[in-house]
Amino acid sequence: MEVSAVLRGVHLSPQKARLVADLVRGKKVDQALNILAFTPKKGAEVIKKVVESAIANAEHNEGADIDELKVTSIYVDKGLVLKRIRARAKGRAGRIIKPTCHITVTVGN
């Protein structure tokens, strides 16, 4: 039994989110939540929210026992890239790139 949760359009670089995702891949869910609670990165609280959602889905939809669940897979895909312009000196313009990502977490036995 595997249950997943997806969070799309997170205002976070996929590269930065993958650093945090690698910390919890393959861990038991209680251990993963503990790691995420004490990781001082923005991506940690976002991924913690998705892991909690996947746990709630498993408990509600499948009636799974939380103590036996582990993070079977977690991956971060590149999302939409917002491009903005910042005015610079002498009539020039600088490009601002605001990356987003999609986070998918799968929990199972």
Swiss-Prot record:
User: What GO MF terms are annotated?
Assistant: rRNA binding; structural constituent of ribosome
Q: Which GO terms describe its cellular component?
A: cytosolic large ribosomal subunit
The alphabetized UniProt keywords are: Ribonucleoprotein, Ribosomal protein, RNA-binding, rRNA-binding
GO BP, one annotated term = translation
Tell me where the transmembrane regions lie: none
HAMAP family named among the record's database cross-references: Ribosomal_uL22_B (MF_01331_B)
Role of this protein: This protein binds specifically to 23S rRNA; its binding is stimulated by other ribosomal proteins, e.g. L4, L17, and L20. It is important during the early stages of 50S assembly. It makes multiple contacts with different domains of the 23S rRNA in the assembled 50S subunit and ribosome.
Q: Which family does it belong to?
A: Belongs to the universal ribosomal protein uL22 family.
Q: Which PANTHER family match?
A: CHLOROPLAST 50S RIBOSOMAL PROTEIN L22-RELATED, LARGE RIBOSOMAL SUBUNIT PROTEIN UL22M
**How does the annotation summarize its subunit structure?**
Part of the 50S ribosomal subunit.
Q: Per its record, how is this protein called by name?
A: Large ribosomal subunit protein uL22
Q: What is the lineage of its organism?
A: Bacteria, Pseudomonadati, Pseudomonadota, Betaproteobacteria, Nitrosomonadales
Q: Which gene encodes it?
A: rplV
